[in-house]
Swiss-Prot record:
InterPro entries: Ergtoxin, Scorpion_toxin-like_sf. The presence of a 'disulfide through disulfide knot' structurally defines this protein as a knottin. The lineage of its organism: Eukaryota, Metazoa, Ecdysozoa, Arthropoda, Chelicerata. It comes from the Eukaryota. It comes from Centruroides elegans (Bark scorpion). Keywords: Disulfide bond, Ion channel impairing toxin, Knottin, Neurotoxin, Potassium channel impairing toxin, Secreted, Toxin, Voltage-gated potassium channel impairing toxin. This is Potassium channel toxin gamma-KTx 1.8. Belongs to the ergtoxin family. Gamma-KTx 1 subfamily. Disulfide bonds join C5-C23, C11-C34, C20-C39, C24-C41. Expressed by the venom gland. It is found in: Secreted. One of its GO terms (cellular component) is extracellular region.
Length: 42
């Protein structure tokens, strides 16, 4: 699911969101970015 990482990691809007990237990559996406403290997979 594209948004499966939203609930797993509350990330910082600015700064380091490696957790989001890792979660999205495990889900089969290229990576992820953080918007409004929520992880969005790309």
């Amino acid at each position: 699911d594209r948004d499966s990482c939203i609930d797993k990691s509350r990330c910082s809007k600015y700064g380091y969101y490696q957790e989001c990237q890792d979660c999205c990559k495990k889900a089969g996406h290229n990576g992820g970015t953080c918007m409004f403290f929520k992880c969005k997979c790309a």
